Amino acid sequence: MSDRAELKRRLARLLVEKSYREGDFVLASGRRSDYYFDCRVTALHAEGSWLIGRLFNDVLKELDIRGVGGMTLGADPLVSSTTALSHEQGRPLHGLLVRKESKGHGTNQFVEGLGNFQPGDAVAMLEDVVTTGGSLLKACRRVQDAGLRIVAVCAILDREEGGRETLKKEGYELHALFTRKELVELARR
């Protein structure tokens, strides 16, 4: 088994153990679901954070980017683990976080961390779970409005509910570590 395959196997086990729930849930998209992956639980777990950072860095290693970002709160631990491990790997990526609403005081900005970037810098956007792609697109627009170029979008989980297609229509190819089918099958074993 390759190193990447072993890392994915370990992360899948943690996601199923820590983040998978069955029940009646309303998703950020407004849709109802009989299962839910709260990836924040895994992303805030020491091993989970390390695995996510390693795997995202592996996905991004061939891209000419200056940093990674995502919508707060779900992307906060993803950005942190990815940036910290990028430095350890000798390819430092800076982080940025997109607010759902501007601060309303101070600089009144939607995007935090811009001081580490120059206008036109290329970045990748990170997301925990993609359902319709709406939250990720909102974050992408705010980052573009701030003057940065988005060259990749990555997620831990693609729920396979149209998000990949929506993102593609907007010019973004989704790089997901897992699909819903992969993780739900594993969870129900």
Regions found by a protein language model. Name each.
Residues S2-L14, R141-R189:
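PRPP-dependent phosphoribosyltransferase catalytic core
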Residues M1-L63:
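Active-site-facing substrate-recognition patch
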Residues L63-G74, V151-C154:
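Short glycine-rich phosphate-binding loop at a beta-alpha junction
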Residues E127-C140, G162-G163:
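Acidic, divalent-metal-coordinating active-site segment for phosphoryl/phosphodiester hydrolysis
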Residues S29, L114-P119, A146, T166-L167:
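Solvent-exposed alpha-helices and their adjacent loops that cap or buttress functional pockets
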Residues F56-R66, C140, Q144-A146:
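Phosphate/pyrophosphate-binding loops at sites that engage ATP/ADP/AMP, CoA/4′-phosphopantetheine
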